[in-house]
Amino acid sequence: MRSSSLRLSAALSLTACLAAAPAHAEAVCNVHAYGAKGDGVTKDTQAIQAAVDACEHKGGGIVLLSAGTYLSAPIVLKSNINLHLDKGSILLGSSDHADYPAITEFRDPGLRSLVSATNAHNVSITGEGVIDGAGQTWWEMARSIKNSGVMGSEHPRPRLVVFDHCKHILLEGITIQNSPMWQLVPYYSDDIDIRNIKVLAPAHSPNTDAVDPFSSSNIRITHLYADVGDDDIAIKSGPANSPGPDSPSRNITITDCTFLHGHGLSIGSEIAGGAQNIHAERIHFDGTDNGIRIKANRDRGNDVSHISFRDIDMKDVKNALIISEFYPKILPPDDLASAPVTRLTPHFHDITIDNLTAVGSASAGAIVGLPEAPIAGVVLHNLHISAARGLTISNAEVSGTGVQVQAAEGEPIAKQAGARVNLQ
């Protein structure tokens, strides 16, 4: 009787994960059936990949990782595959750097990600397990190179989970952590659901962005918990000095998320393809370096428009609100001259922020455009910011009602060159 109950429980569990994921055939490929040990010592790469390939051959289905630690080099997911990580399962990236082959990724030299899919559709990663990139040795290498003082001494690091030119993607329930670099990257992909996941990395781990949609569209991110070393979300669409062509990121909703350590919710700075129709609502920031941040500069910009934020609360966030066409600096010099408008000049406009509360900030922030491309149509409603320093506005058109900035030092709202401000 107990055996029958266990079989019924397993069947119900698998039925539930199928219902949650994009439609797949009902094949179940348990990686243990293909030789996986799950002991944290044996490399299970071949077994996991064999399970993926077998499921694909059957028309799709679930690749199942039951409780255990599966040490692995990179694996590649295929169409109609649900990689399901049971509670207590860990897919652990190999710490052997030689296991990550060199590839051209995002037009640049890179290393293959631990989990990736390319030109695939109906792909999901679900469950209550963990994907761990074992990034510690990569971070140490990155710090060593940075501290060497040798300019241009970059060495590529792998991302953790990448969807490249994919459609109909779901990530649900899992924890993603300790990536060598960016953690979850949809690249030129479409129709993506990211819900109820955690993305984690130590606060000072370099470049460990949580979620970085890159030239991707129709994305729904909800109940994301991010506690990382860089951007909690960074929406991107094209690198600095991009030769083009670049595609925008657009039609993205971000709701009911919590961000702890990290650099906040960002659009940019690599935004050479532009970004439109992005909405964030009910976001809680606690101790991030930044809150809302839209950033670009003269060598990586494009049209960034129809952006809205609603019901945002922040506690002990260093910079509450940054909208800057002068990244990485927040404020330009007083004598900043106009420059010729090019294909990569940023154009920020039609940005709305409703109901934002921030307490304990070091700075209320800045809204800073370029003299040749002033920011237009920023509308603020019901902003209540308490900070050591106020909000600086230059080369920008800002209007709104119910805006209260309390600054312990200096002006609450400082208007500099090119500021057109109508706040009540």
Which residue ranges define each predicted feature?
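Bacterial N-terminal signal peptides that target proteins for export
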Residues: M1-A10
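Short intrinsically disordered, low-complexity coil segments enriched in acidic
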Residues: R2-S3, C17-A20, L65, I233
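Bacterial N-terminal signal peptides
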Residues: S9-A19
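Extracellular/periplasmic carbohydrate-active domains that bind, remodel
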Residues: H24-Q424
